[in-house]
Amino acid sequence: MEAMFKHRGKADSIIGKKNISNYESIYNHISSLQNKKTLPFDGKYLSDNELASNIYKKKYYIKDLNNQIIESCPEDVFKRVSSFIAASETSTSKQKKWAEIFYKDLYNGYFLPGGRVFAGAGDIYRLKTLANCFVSKIEKDEI
């Protein structure tokens, strides 16, 4: 992940260097809490569920520019998503607070964003839409 935060591309101009810096800082904060066991992390979130593991590998774990997976468990995804979302808060204390809350909610299954958010939030290598569905107004229905 360190290489991803150093990567310079479209994300710099769209997300903004300050937001990326905030994101990296919060990501490292959540990592330290995982390491201290202050936040839940055991690396076995999926147990031995092969189907769930394959889904995470194919859809949700982000890949580097060489197409190599750089996340290894759902807790990595929770860390990335919670850090990226919380980085938009207005102060460092709020960013940390909300990243921790988002992480716990994701881990406990209280909050589950759509697949596009899981796949794209915080991926600095590739810009992806975070919108899961689009709604179009139907002017006239004759059914």
Residue ranges and their predicted role:
Residues 1-143:
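Extended catalytic cores of very large enzyme megasubunits
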